[in-house]
């Protein structure tokens, strides 16, 4: 039995109980009969791998699960009760931002003893966050409906999500979380094209496109302060790929099983994006001024919880976020973006991008 350790926002304690028999009942609860039936209908094994996908603006969390074909299919969508901060990645401790990016969840990040019923630590900061000088701690997917940098799901929903994650970790080392600001459509990217995070989001979209085009889990690496997806050694290369999160990216190619399908999706999206810009689609406000959001299904039950961000952030802290200076970088010729996702003529998908870092 894989140990599920106590590791969470509410204690960061060393594990005392590591066997399923000694864990609290809420952490060992079996999947419901309805969920087991759904798995059977979708041809998914109880302990097959999962991927969790989070869409902040829509306030939805999806659990995808590998079926008997070896590809991931959507199992279930859960409405998010509460997330805090604004659209955009976590930058520094105390900014109330919820993480965006790609995170690897190991058994030690499962917290059966959370004060918020059950919790899954997202593993922030990951190597990308560290390479870009971002910090924060104990950022979770948990129960309850309150958030300070976490995705709060309610106790009932986290019970099911936690159980699915627990079963998926039996016999394997980890599963992946993909956290996005919104569904990565051309329309949403066009609406948010003036955001200081637009370049970061376009980088996330590459990973999103790999998954949506293939329904296969992407391998994720970090080099040069950026994400790299499904990298393979170049043909006739004798050297193994080594990725330094802060160093220059090595020469690589993209897994050919993924590259062509992802490229087709990217090209179609690129054309749609260019047309939206040509039509002068309306631009969303860069910052909403509100502290996060929640799915509409919870608004009647929890009225008045979405307040101005200024009410919950200390003066001179997160309110400085819009004034942060971006750090420029340009893709090298061997990068995935240049090799497989070059912009179409006249498109607004630029290869020169900027990633925000906190002022120190």
Region annotations inferred by a language model:
Residues 94-252, 256-257:
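Exported/periplasmic cell-wall-interacting domains
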Residues 33-51, 63-65, 82-93, 100-106, ...:
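N-terminal post-signal-peptidase region of extra-cytosolic proteins
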Residues 31, 185-360:
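Low-complexity, Gly/Ser/Thr/Pro-rich intrinsically disordered linker/tail segments
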Residues 7-46:
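Extracellular/luminal recognition modules and glycoprotein regions
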Residues 67-83:
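Short Gly/aromatic-enriched secondary-structure transition segments
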Residues 61-66, 154:
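A short alpha-helix/helix-coil micro-patch that ends at or immediately precedes a cysteine
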